Amino acid sequence: MLLEFLLLIGISLSTACPSECRCAGLDVHCEGKNLTAIPGHIPIATTNLYFSNNLLNSLSKSNFQALPNLQYLDLSNNSIRDIEETLLDSFPGLKYLDLSWNKIRYVPKLSTAPNALVSLNLVHNEISRLDNDLVSHSPYMQTFLIQRNRIQSLPHDFFNSRMVPTLKTVKMAGNPWSCDCRMVNVKQFADSLFAHSNQNIFIVGKCFFPKGLRNYVFRNLSIENLECEKPEYSKTDDGMFKMSCPNNEMEGYHYDSIFLENNKEARHTAHFARDKDGSLLSNGQFTRNYQCAFYRQKQSIHMQKKMQASSSTEPPITTTTMEPMTTSTMDSMDTTESVVTMTTMPEIDTKIVFEHKQLDTTSRDGETLELKCEASGEPTPTITWLFEKQKLTESRKHKLTKNGSVLKIFPFLNTDIGQYECVASNGEESKSHIFSVSLKESEQPVIIDAPMDTNATIGQQVTLRCNAKGFPVPDVVWLFEGIRIPRRNTRYTISDNNIELTIEKVTRHDSGVFTCQAVNSVGSAVATANLLVGAELTEKVDKLLDDSTIEKIAKEAKQKVEKALSSTKDQQRMDKIESPNDLSKLFKFAINLKKVDLGKAREIYEESIRLVQMHIDNGLAFESAMISPNVSYEAVLPVSYVQTLMEKSGCQTGQFAESCEDHCFFSKYRSYDGQCNNHEHPWWGVSEMAFMRLLPPRYENGFNTPVGWEKGKRYNGYEVPNARKVSRVLIGTDETTPHSHLSAMTMQWGQFIDHDLTLTAPALTRHSYKEGAFCNRTCENADPCFNIQLEADDPKLHTGLYQKHPCMEFERNGAACGSGETSPIFQRVTYRDQLNLLTSYLDASGIYGNSEEQALELRDLYSDHGLLRFDIVSGANKPYMPFEKDSDMDCRRNFSRENPIKCFLAGDVRANEQLGLMSMHTIFLREHNRIASRLLEVNENWDGETIFQETRKLIGAMLQHITYNAWLPKILGKATYNTIIGEYKGYNPDVNPTIANEFATAALRFAHTLINTHLFRFDKDFKETKQGHLPLHNAFFAPERLVSEGGVDPLLRGLFAAPIKMPRPDQVLNKELTEKLFNRFHEVALDLAALNIQRGRDHGLPSWTEYRKFCNLTVPKTWSDMKNIVQNDTVISKLQSLYGVTENIDLWVGGVTEKRTADALMGPTLACIIADQFKRLRDGDRFWYENEEMFSKAQLRQIKKVTLSKIICTNGDDIDRIQRDIFVYHGNSTQFYEPCESLPEINLNMWTTCCDAMCSSSSTLARNAIGGDEKAKRRKRRHHHSKKSCHDKGKRRKSGDRWNHSNDICVECMCHDGEVWCKTNNFCKSQV
């Protein structure tokens, strides 16, 4: 049973929604219901709870059951007076508590131990006293608000220095503050907070007492101003010693005297008595140095004169009759005070005071001018800006920040010279301040630190400096041989201030003239430096090599690579496929021939360089000082030889360029390979192009060898750790924790979308080019082999299979030939970049493919109805994906022989990877055909091509909408999503959507931390199916299970009705992935974590700390710095033992061990990379669904109704209930599942046209006539596919003919595109 299963994994959730409230996901809304008590049975998984605008009058722990996941509690606008102590013990995860606009008088201690509060709002209550530990028990507190209460002073040490790093905003104005010695601690803390960051806000407001400081702004006072009274000493008639406080200012007030020692209420050891006037009486003399102050009350106060029980939530009331006071009584004076009922608040002056006045200033032409005016008052005033008596409003030129108190003008011009006025008003008063801005003379740049001529050896690091002065501050630009050096994606590193240019490993190609140019609006200055690299060595190399030698080397390299590729294919055909691991390798090497050629060219080129090295080493006896270690020998070759090797390898050919002349088609529909999307940057986002990089790569030789290639090499004093060891020590876990409120579909959608965006070109061969050995038969690092060594204590060695070659097989991914740029900089040494075989755009290419050939293979061209083809259907008569026919990828070669079938065919070659992914591909094939059929009904004038393209366009829009509106905010957290991605503001052709290497190779692989040990399978009643849940290692490449074990429904229910694994730094990857990946019986398993780490090194990704710097995050220099980033001492200790220094931590490892950001599934570094990528994917896509040119407003409204839940309901076999937000997990209760018919549905009538100009047929024919290009010819040929005839047992059948196979009425056959297709009739299936 489902309930039993959930209990087994530790989940027991009460999810009933209170009848008085409305529940939406994990939010419970009970606002404005006139509630006088908290309703019971609040769902235990609740994260946000809203009780504002009710009639609640008290809060106690008995009102709430424990809500461990509660993060936000809104109790504003009630009548709450009493709060029970330690209330927050019931909400250990509560971060935001809003108690504003109530009638609270005293706030007690809220928790027994430090709590998780980030924000506490107590605005507009009747609070006169706060517990001493209220804020100090909240170590994560960032915002504390107590404006408009009745607080005269705060307890001593209410704020302490430990709060300085976290507390950002404190607002306490509107209280009748007594600015005396009791406030010294507050003043000291405020000064510390501002010293820590001038962005912090700490507002106390104005003093009310003493009279001499009334209406003074607290912030402007010095500590010397905060004085208390000196007591007066006397002796009574009966011999008692008396200490009293002068009451010169107390006319019109009741008051209590308070005696202090060192600014803190005094604790006494002697026996005292309290006189009726508040003085202290003692039998002996007062020996300590006391001060005194008052707790003041107005004449209209009704005082309660009776001592209350100490158990009250408010402080007990002191007596006014004279009686002996014991030590314990005096000790209680620290925590007791008169409780009063005040009929009116002390009047606070509404006078506006300018806290900061902008002085007359000057500015230079073209710079940014910042003007500042700050004012205080009650109510808080607003600032308005005027220039020459004309009001200034927000614009591109004028920016208002900090609630209008700061005005930024850019660019400042002559027309901005004149008189400015800032006006502060609060509805009761208005004040203004006038000042002038004049023009300051500009200065032409002068270079004060010019670069110097330099001689360097090959492989040496060279840094050139260029510093300049002038006004405006000049920008420094670097050029090489007259061509500007870009900041990113070259071997040159330019410092943040542009002053330094660093070349990591210089080559002979860097010899030349470097220029620095300092430029501002006035003029420019130029300085040059000559760099000469390896003159002696390059002279010898030029004598050793000639054109014929280079030709021979290129030919030999090509033969070696082609031989290795041929051997791999031969072995592939001979190998016995006994496991998903074997099948995975088969898929890996069965890629499109064109893509093979693209990758092979780079492999030939790199092998040519290795042969050049051998030739030079054998022919020259040069000293080691002439070339630095770990430098590619490409660095010593002349440019002409490099170009020859590139030409001979095939590296100078690239992607076929689409003409994009068919404006009708490409204005409405995407190309398959991403071309014709961005007309200004035609290669951005295109398939079969290199990934872009956020940071320059870190290769061991600066060219192509990964970190760890040379054994024993140290980085920052330490060797990089073995990838498998990192996985064993840090990553793998036997224990997993289920997520409290996100479903397993969160992970599955991530994989589905990833396969739409990234597919790195794999290695072409499993043979070493150098020795010809299989990669699994050597542990040497020899391209393409980069195997992972197994250490002596590794359990994998116990199998005996690794005894001879104790390493895990790993081939390097293929490489791109180059960037395609033509500048001299890029014709020199180019580091190794990897190839993305897919389009970068989120365009449903995983469904339709990345080329027209793929799309035609997937389409049903017989009917010309725009459908995707299929071969078999489910019991519900809904199609499965078609089978592969002509590929080497044959899932019948898998171990499972009881129901062998071929692999399914989809737009992405990985569709068969696991059953959950197969289900998603199946659902979207069905959704395509459903939409296409409906579009044909409402548009009888459309041909099949138009229907197909319109459906493809709509499916792509659906994927975009689901991803950005439902999925991304959950994985990134709403705050990160809103900050980095934000609202869509239109297409920008200057935004590069190309997938970043860091995103594909590390960041998006965070999703591996979400994978469960099993694929859950539930029946219609949400109970485990008779086949049971499927261990993950049995779900790979098993399409027969999809067909024979219940179809897609059990798997889909398992995705939306079960939770994902919780990502935790101490539970990163379950051991199904680190110890059993692709495992089957005797087969030795792979390790996904080790593969991720090794792949990051293969791709030359810099360390994790470099990306923290890139994302403007704090960069840990020491291991103690890690405590605020990882927040798990055990994990930090393991990282230290593995890496030695923080600078060596791999990006993926650092990313998955960081503390997760609020509401996110990852830490800030990976979130930064992922959010940056998805923002670029959206903003740089001309076909983005919200671009007003793509869909009509009516169509867009319909698209925004789309949910993945509805798509699954519509296309599942028999799914009738589902949650509205499919990514939210609601525990073991089905009450959150809604009937499918209640979910919103897209209205396809909005796509009805009567006379729409179609691009499909006419424009296709036009393109054939104009260009005659191969792609257009293929489009034309599609209309003739249906004319092919078939031969069946000697009979010739026309295309479209149907007949019974061998007169068997249960089997119907059809001639389609020259092929015979047969299926079993449904009525026969039901009989069976």
UniProtKB/Swiss-Prot annotation:
Here the disulfide bonds are C373-C422, C466-C516, C660-C676, C775-C785, C779-C807, C1111-C1168, C1209-C1236
List required co-factors: Ca(2+); heme b
Provide the residue positions that the database annotates as binding heme b.
D754, E913, H1008
As to how many cofactors bind and how, the note says: Binds 1 Ca(2+) ion per heterodimer. Binds 1 heme b (iron(II)-protoporphyrin IX) group covalently per heterodimer.
Q: Where is this site: Transition state stabilizer?
A: R910
Q: What is its EC number?
A: 1.11.2.-
Region span, Disordered = 305-332, 1266-1297
Q: Where are the LRR repeats?
A: 42-66, 67-90, 92-114, 116-137, 138-161, 164-191, 1085-1109, 1204-1225
LRRNT domain boundaries = 17-45
Query: Where does the UniProt annotation place the signal sequence?
Result: 1-16
**GO terms for cellular component:** basement membrane; extracellular space
Listed InterPro entries: Haem_peroxidase_animal, Haem_peroxidase_sf, Haem_peroxidase_sf_animal, Ig-like_dom, Ig-like_dom_sf, Ig-like_fold, Ig_I-set, Ig_sub
Glycosylation sites per record: N34, N77, N220, N403, N455, N630, N776, N894, N1112, N1128, N1228, N1300
Q: Where is the active site?
A: H755 (proton acceptor)
- Report where it is expressed, by tissue: Expressed in vulval muscles and in some neurons including PVQ. Expressed in the hypodermis and in coelomocytes.
Family from the record: Belongs to the peroxidase family. XPO subfamily.
Q: What does this protein do?
A: Catalyzes the two-electron oxidation of bromide by hydrogen peroxide and generates hypobromite as a reactive intermediate which mediates the formation of sulfilimine cross-links between methionine and hydroxylysine residues within an uncross-linked collagen IV/COL4A1 NC1 hexamer. Required for embryonic morphogenesis playing a role in epidermal elongation at the twofold stage of embryonic development. Required post-embryonically for basement membrane integrity and muscle-epidermal attachments, and specifically in the function of basement membrane components such as the type IV collagens.
Its recorded name reads: Peroxidasin homolog pxn-2
Give the source species. Caenorhabditis elegans
